Amino acid sequence: TINVEGTDKAHSYDMPFSAVHVIVPKERTEEALIAARDAGARGVTIMEAHGMGLSEMDNFYNRLHASATDSNLMFITKTKNVDNIIKSVLTKLDITGEGQGLTFAYPVSHIKGLRLKIDDI
C-alpha cells in the first residue's frame, strides 16, 4: 500500500521497487546522502554498521563488541532510480577499493507504509 502525500488516499500500485544499500565510513555519510538525493532518492534509513575483512575473522568475538565505524544507508526507491543512485554515489565519493564503501541493490515487494508524491506515481 502506497500513501499519496497530501491526501488521505492509500492505494495498491503495481510498481517495481528496490532497496539500495550504501555502506560508507561514518565521516562520508553526508556526502553519500547528498549524492543519492541528487540522483533521485527521496528517503533513507540510516543504520550504524561495522565491517570486517576475512583476515579479521580470527578474532571475531572481539570484533562483535567494536563500535560502529560505518553507516549503512538504505533507500527504498522505484527500481528505475537504482542505477542513477548507485552511479552517483560511486562517482561522487570515488569508491574504488576495499574499505572505501560498498553499494548493492535488490528488488523488494509487499511494501506497506511508503509515502510518495503524486508526481512520483
Residue ranges and their predicted role:
Residues 1-121:
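Positively charged, small/polar-rich N-terminal and surface patches that mediate targeting and assembly
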